[in-house]
């Protein structure tokens, strides 16, 4: 039986908010085909802005992986993530044209602004490497699990949205998330009690921010 790590224990402990983030009503509406396409357009515009703020965060993760990890493979995993973000931004631009979303006119809503400030806080040199890697995994994993759900057997995902679902729900991205999780777990194994507490708090905060982001896409703030 595979050994369960610290992150799995935390997910069990905070199962309610984890489920709220990975099986949100917005995601479920995509899977069952009832999604309001205006909500999808809102999500598209807001997520494009988020990704542009996510890039410098991942760049900071790369620097920390080079300086603080002690494992050269960490840098390679994060570098792969940065490379994929360039393609992701181009994908958003194509989708924006397809859905008539002019990103230059999109204003970040409150949930997006709060998430952006959270990312900036994580970029502080005061934040410990295990905490950063836990947050990095959680941010990526929520999208992977959410959009993979939209591709599972029995889905009624609208054909025009399958591209978005495949972008984050594919097996390659799942493997990437697993690699990031392994890094986080390795770091957490030897972390102090204080750092473990900070990492758990950050994990929960990511999940809360993800729920708020989905809510925003459905018409909230």
UniProtKB/Swiss-Prot annotation:
Its EC number is 3.5.1.-, 3.5.99.2. It is an enzyme of class 3 (hydrolase). Disruption phenotype: No visible phenotype. InterPro entries: Haem_Oase-like_multi-hlx, TenA_E, Thiaminase-2/PQQC, Thiamine_Salvage_TenA. One of its GO terms (biological process) is thiamine biosynthetic process. It comes from the Eukaryota. Pathway: Cofactor biosynthesis; thiamine diphosphate biosynthesis. Expressed in roots and shoots. Substrate binds at residues 47, 88, 140. Keywords: Disulfide bond, Hydrolase, Thiamine biosynthesis. The active site is at 210 (proton donor). Belongs to the thiaminase-2 family. This is Bifunctional TENA-E protein. It comes from Arabidopsis thaliana.
